[in-house]
Regions:
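N-terminal DNA-binding module of tyrosine recombinases/phage integrases
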Residues: 7-10, 17-120, 281-296, 307, ...
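Catalytic-site neighborhood detector that most strongly recognizes the C-terminal catalytic loop/helix
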Residues: 179, 187, 245, 357-382
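DNA/chromatin major-groove-contacting recognition/catalytic segments
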Residues: 122, 195-199, 250-255, 370-395
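Basic, Lys/Arg- and aromatic-enriched nucleic-acid-binding interface segment
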Residues: 138-142, 146-148, 161-227, 235, ...
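C-terminal secondary-structure termini that scaffold catalytic or DNA-interacting sites
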Residues: 236, 249-263, 267-272, 278, ...
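N-terminal core-binding DNA-recognition domain of tyrosine site-specific recombinases/integrases
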Residues: 3, 38-43, 64-67, 79-164, ...
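C-terminal catalytic core of tyrosine-transesterase DNA break-rejoin enzymes
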Residues: 161, 212, 216-223, 313, ...
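Active-site/catalytic core of tyrosine-dependent DNA strand-transfer enzymes
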Residues: 190-194, 236, 244, 269-328
C-alpha cells in the first residue's frame, strides 16, 4: 500500500516493492504538487488518487518496482532464475566470474543506471588486463573476454526480460568486443601421436587405458572419468556414455548428464578391450590387497584407495606425462580433436563422427572438416610448387 507524506507544499508518495538480499526495503517514490487554488478537501482526494495510480503503475511494470535495485542485489535472483537452464558446472563458473569480476566492477551500480559505456569499460579492462581473476595483470584472450561478457549480458538480459530495465545495455550491437582472430584447433599429427604412444608403454596400465580410450572414443574428460565397469560391454566392444563427472568446491565428486543430455554407445577396437580386461584384473588385485581400506565402487579410473578420480585428473595426469617425456604440450582435449580429425581424414561419415563425439549439432563437427580442408590446400600448394619447379627445369 502506498504511503503519503506532506513535505512543505508537496506530497511524497512511496510504494514498497520488497526487500533486497541484505534485508533492506526497496522503495519507489514520486512527488506530487497540488495546483494553486485547490481546497484542502480537493488536495486530499487528488493525492489519494495519485497514490493509487502510482501504485498501479509500479505493480504493472510501467514504473520499475525496483528502481533502486543494485546489480549486486539482483544477482541472487538471476542465479535462481537460470538454475536448471544451464549445467551445474556452468552455474559454478558463472558464480565465480560474478563474484570475482562483475560485482567488484559493477555491483555497486543501480540496474537502471547501467549504460553501454559501463559495459564497454568493463570489456576494455578485461582486454587490457586491468581486471584479472588471478592478479597477473596480463590481458585476457579475446575468447575469454567474450565468455565473461556473455555472463554479464545474460544477467542484464534477465533483468530486461523481467522489465526491471527498459533495455539491455550489454546488447552485442552496442558493445565492441575484441577480435577473435584465426581460431586453431589443437590436433596431434600422426608422427606426434606415434611418438606419444611409444612413450605411453612405460606408463601405468590405468593411464594407458585412459589415453587409448580418449583417442579411440573422442570422449570428453568428464565422460571418461565417470566410466564404470558396467558401462563396458566386452562382448559387443562398446562403451556406454551416459554421464559426466564434476566437482564443486566444498562438495563431493558427483555425476551429471552428458553435455547434450543424451547417452550414446561408442565402439572400440579389440586392443582396447584387451587393455581394459588387463586393467580390470589388476584393479581387482589392488582391491583385494587393500581389503577394508578400499573405498571404491565400480569405477574404471580410480585413486589409490579405489575412489573415483577427480574430473580434472585426466588433464593433470596428461600434462605431467607430456612434461616427463619432453613431448610437445597440448591440452587433453586435443585427443578428442585428434580422434575426430583422424576419422574424417580416413573417410568416416561426418554424421557418424558427430554422433560418436556426442555433438548436439553437426555444425560443431564441421570445424574439423575446415581444418582438414586447409591442410589439403597446403598440400595442394606444395605439390603445385613441385610440379611448377619441374616444368621450369624442363624448359
Amino acid at each position: 500500500m502506498a504511503t503519503i507524506t506532506k513535505r512543505g507544499d508537496n506530497y511524497r508518495i512511496r510504494v514498497s516493492c520488497g526487500y533486497d538480499v541484505s534485508g533492506k526495503q526497496l522503495v519507489q517514490s514520486m512527488t506530487w504538487k497540488p495546483e494553486s487554488g485547490m481546497t484542502a478537501r480537493q488536495i486530499e482526494k487528488e493525492v489519494k488518487k495519485q497514490a493509487t495510480l502510482f501504485e498501479e503503475r509500479v505493480q504493472n511494470g510501467t514504473v520499475s518496482a525496483c528502481g533502486s535495485l543494485k546489480l549486486a542485489d539482483f544477482i541472487p535472483q538471476y542465479l535462481e532464475n537460470v538454475r536448471g537452464e544451464i549445467s551445474v558446472t556452468t552455474l559454478e563458473n558463472y558464480k565465480r566470474i560474478i563474484r570475482e569480476l562483475i560485482i567488484p566492477a559493477l555491483g555497486h551500480l543501480k540496474l537502471k543506471d547501467i549504460k553501454p559505456l559501463h559495459i564497454q569499460k568493463f570489456v576494455n579492462a578485461l582486454t587490457s588486463g586491468e581486471y584479472r581473476l588471478d592478479g597477473k595483470g596480463k590481458p585476457y584472450k579475446p575468447a575469454t573476454v567474450r565468455r565473461y561478457y556473455v555472463v554479464l549480458q545474460s544477467i542484464l538480459h534477465n533483468a530486461y526480460r523481467l522489465e526491471l530495465i527498459a533495455s539491455n545495455p550489454a546488447d552485442s550491437q552496442k558493445i565492441k568486443l575484441p577480435a577473435m582472430g584465426e581460431q586453431t584447433t589443437e590436433i596431434y599429427s600422426k608422427e606426434e601421436l606415434a611418438e606419444m604412444l611409444q612413450c605411453l608403454d612405460n606408463e601405468s596400465l590405468m593411464f594407458q587405458v585412459l589415453i587409448h580410450l580418449a583417442i579411440n572414443t573422442g570422449c570428453r574428460r568428464g565422460e571418461l572419468a565417470a566410466l564404470e565397469w558396467s558401462d563396458i560391454n566386452f562382448n559387443e566392444r562398446t562403451i556406454h556414455i551416459s554421464k559426466s563427472l564434476y566437482k564443486i568446491k566444498g562438495e563431493p565428486i558427483q555425476t551429471k548428464d552428458t553435455k547434450t543430455h543424451e547417452s550414446r554407445k561408442v565402439a572400440i577396437p579389440e586392443y582396447c578391450i584387451k587393455l581394459l580386461k588387463r586393467w580390470q584384473a589388476q584393479q581387482a588385485e589392488i582391491r583385494l590387497k587393500l581389503g577394508t581400506a578400499w573405498k571404491g565402487a565400480n569405477w574404471v579410473f580410480i585413486q589409490s584407495d579405489g575412489s573415483v578420480i577427480y574430473p580434472t585428473s585426466p588433464t593433470l595426469m596428461f600434462s605431467d606425462f607430456l612434461k616427463r617425456n619432453e613431448l610437445p604440450h597440448k591440452k587433453f582435449h586435443a585427443l578428442r580433436h585428434t580422434s575426430a580429425t583422424l576419422l574424417l581424414v580416413s573417410g568416416a561419415n561426418i554424421k557418424n563422427v558427430s554422433a560418436r563425439l556426442g555433438h548436439a549439432q553437426i555444425t560443431t563437427t564441421n570445424r574439423y572438416v575446415h581444418a582438414i580442408e586447409e591442410a589439403d590446400r597446403v598440400a595442394g600448394d606444395i605439390l603445385g610448387n613441385i610440379v611448377s619447379d619441374l616444368q621450369l627445369k624442363k624448359a
